[in-house]
Amino acid sequence: MLFTTGVYTLDRLQLLVFRKAVLTDLLSKPGPVGEVLAAVDSHLLLTRPYLAEGGEAWEASHYWLAVASLFPDSIQRVQGEDIRRLENAASPQEALFWSVRQERRPHKDETLIRRAEFVEHGRQVLLARLANERRGPYEGYPLELQEQLARRFSPAHMWSASRLESYGSCPQRFYVDNALALEAKQAPELGFDVLQLGSMLHRILERTFRRLGDPHDLQAVQESLSAVMEEEFAQAPQRYGFRPGPLWEAEQADLSQRLVRCVENLVQESAGWTPVAFEQAFGIGAVAPLRMETGSGVVLLRGFIDRVDRNAQGELRVLDYKTGGSHLGKNDLIAGYRLQLPLYALGARQALGLGEPVEGLYWNIRAGEAGALKLASFKHEERLGIEAAIQTAREHVERIISGVRAAQFPPIPPKGGCPSYCPASAWCWRYEPGF
């Protein structure tokens, strides 16, 4: 128990007169001090600081002096460097602190042994994270798992573009999300989440254009969109598993406006192109995967291409719908954050045999516009065009596969910050809030 100095200063004579009254008063009034004193069985340990933070003497309170006058021979002054018996510690934490401070590691008490091991583990983690060269299992290099990871992600493993992009944006995120398969528990909320919104908007666009005879007839596109939105919004809560919130009507109105602008701009952007495939899968079910040759061997890929268009010359354009607008530029492919578009272009040509892709773009649904990256005009180093984009993606795939099999998962926040949906966002020591 800690008795500290109050606002009163009493001389010795006053204390002798009032000491019994003070203790009687403490016992009679409800409060933690009275409760503790009343509950004493055989022993009571009272403590107080005798030095302030600046080193000056800490004056005792009149409560302390009243108690001390009754037991003058029981007062001991303990200094920090004094060796004390561990059984006199007030808590397991204090006992462990004393043992470490006195360089006496516990050998008999199992509880203290486990606590000491836990503290030592934490010290090793902290040292690893403070080191100039960030290596070891606590900095994303669990090298003891190399053999296991190499077997799990062998040449027979089926990859998706999103998993590759996960490693490309932050290797630690891939490790937590895919290798460890950890998920952050989310509190139930009203309304849809990001994934549900993306699925809903993808389905609306796919159904809007799939049912059209002439995808260039803007009026027909608008009428098709209106009918599809009415059906999809009515079924969305049940189909995607969310509970509509009080703003659901307003959200439908906002999404409707965005989708109308989206299809109008998409029709204009698609002059000379005709949709020939929607939600085209490869590497799923009976459809063969994309077999990509890399320096790490053959890599098997699967995916869903949102839309494939063809022009009058029989050439292909690959479209990938995105709900958000982050990381849709040329530099995101160069950095390895976005690999989907060139991989899907290669999948359309090689796995599906649909023809020769000459263009590809991300389409931002909510903004109603194309992303900055266009495969036909992509340029990196001395390479130009769609083949340059495919080769850039191939190099990233090789780097990623090699890193995964070598158990290299350093936490590297992507440019612009980390996504809030990263499963490690609650505890990652390198987490930087971003998009």
Q: What do these predicted regions represent?
A:
Residues 85-98:
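Charged, amphipathic alpha-helical linkers/stalks
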Residues 78-85:
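Intrinsically disordered, low-complexity intracellular terminal segments
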Residues 19-27, 86, 112, 118, ...:
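Extended hydrophobic/Leu-rich segments
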Residues 1-39, 329:
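Conserved helicase C-terminal RecA-like lobe
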Residues 1, 45-47, 54-77, 99-435:
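RecB-family 4Fe-4S metal-dependent nuclease core
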